[in-house]
Amino acid sequence: MIEMEPDTHIISALVEHKPGVLQRVAGLFTRRGFNIENITVGESETPGIARMTIIARGDDRVLEQITKQLNKLIDVIKVRDLEPAATVKRELCMVKVHAPSESERSEIIQYTNIFRGRIVDVSPDALTVEVTGDSEKIDAFLELLRNFGIKELARTGPTAMSRGSRTM
């Protein structure tokens, strides 16, 4: 779980979508001693441009240095420190759950429906479930599934945008 502690920052960056950019961005954080808790990268609304969402910890002074240094990288187009209260964050989780009996399957399906998830794969002794939402929702869902036995788990980590009509 990525908890938003006071020294945790959500940094959104638009970058050129080409090889080596992620490595240069991560290297900048490493050199400054600014720990990356999570990073997600994907295409944006503009062809050839990717959006990075970086969850990182550090004080405001270090964040200001990082933001300035990111803006100096040739492949970085724009950087913004997102205010947690004015940000929409979501992540995706896929979890394979041990479910050999009909009663266990039924209970897992009920939990999945309550959390508005989807069953994406079924095998004789397991269900694979997909759920999206904020980190707290996913943590709560996983806590319920732990009683059945989690066989495999994959989480994307949060991706984020500013609320309202404001854009990068």
From Swiss-Prot:
InterPro entries in alphabetical order: Acetalactate_synth_ssu, Acetolactate_synth/TF_NikR_C, Acetolactate_synth_ssu_C, ACT-like_dom_sf, ACT_dom, AHAS_ACT, AHAS_small-like_ACT
Pfam families: ACT_AHAS_ss, ALS_ss_C
Assigned keywords, A-Z: Amino-acid biosynthesis, Branched-chain amino acid biosynthesis, Transferase
GO BP terms in the entry: isoleucine biosynthetic process; L-valine biosynthetic process
NCBIfam families in the cross-refs: acolac_sm, PRK11895.1
Entry annotated with the keyword Ligase: no
Transmembrane annotation, as ranges: none
PROSITE patterns found in the cross-reference section: ACT (PS51671)
Protein name: Probable acetolactate synthase small subunit
Quaternary structure (record): Dimer of large and small chains.
EC annotation from Swiss-Prot or TrEMBL: 2.2.1.6
Pathway: Amino-acid biosynthesis; L-isoleucine biosynthesis; L-isoleucine from 2-oxobutanoate: step 1/4; Amino-acid biosynthesis; L-valine biosynthesis; L-valine from pyruvate: step 1/4
Gene Ontology cellular-component terms listed: cytosol
